[in-house]
Amino acid sequence: MRVIASSIRKGNVLEQDGKLYVVLSAENIHPGKGTPVSQIEMRRISDGVKISERYKTTDHVEKVTIEERNYSFLYEDGEGFHFMEPESYDQVQVTKDVVGSAAPYLQEGMVVKLSMHDTTAVAITLPQRATLEVVDTEPVTKGQTASSSYKPAVLSNGVRTQVPPHIGTGTRIVVLTEDGSYVERAKD
């Protein structure tokens, strides 16, 4: 489907020179003099190469239709990440380039949304929150529960975050998968 360059957004998939690209960022620039342009940063799906393109906002680009489906995460090996479609039990392998910064938050059985073009995964969307265990943090200090200060902690997936002073090692907490920030103590 041909669309004007100014309508391209992050997460869209474009076809250029017979290759598929996922849009990492898209910015419309309106200089004081000259023609407005769209600065688009993309990653080639086949090999992960990042490129940056500049189009006039009125130029047409080829946008590819993608389908979002739920998949369960199975495991990771040297070849990539393996997911299963719950209804048909079809399995797909997703490369490390596509998973990117979502990798530390993947847990066995976690349901994620994969954006698919034909049989190729082009993007992954995690649930907003994940429950993880604190494996290393400073000891709990009595009398600090009323303060709003935070202390550093390392989670079971290796991500570093800031937690309230009353959270100790071994505590399960809920974090945002977008940035790893603390939300609450887990209720399980």
Curated annotation (Swiss-Prot):
SUPFAM superfamilies: Nucleic acid-binding proteins (SSF50249), Translation proteins SH3-like domain (SSF50104). Transmembrane segments: none annotated. Pathway: Protein biosynthesis; polypeptide chain elongation. InterPro entries: Elong-fact-P_C (IPR015365), NA-bd_OB-fold (IPR012340), Rib_uL2_dom2 (IPR014722), Transl_elong_fac_P/YeiP (IPR020599), Transl_elong_KOW-like (IPR013185), Transl_elong_P/YeiP_cen (IPR001059), Transl_elong_P/YeiP_CS (IPR013852), Transl_elongation_fac_P (IPR011768). It is found in: Cytoplasm. Signal peptide: none annotated. GO terms for molecular function: translation elongation factor activity. Disulfide bonds: none annotated. Gene3D superfamilies: 2.30.30.30, Nucleic acid-binding proteins. One of its GO terms (biological process) is peptide biosynthetic process. GO terms for cellular component: cytoplasm. The keyword Zinc does not apply. Coiled coil: none annotated. Keywords: Cytoplasm, Elongation factor, Protein biosynthesis. The keyword Cell membrane does not apply. Belongs to the elongation factor P family. NCBIfam families: efp, PRK00529.1. Involved in peptide bond synthesis. Stimulates efficient translation and peptide-bond synthesis on native or reconstituted 70S ribosomes in vitro. Probably functions indirectly by altering the affinity of the ribosome for aminoacyl-tRNA, thus increasing their reactivity as acceptors for peptidyl transferase. This is Elongation factor P. It comes from Rhodopseudomonas palustris (strain TIE-1).
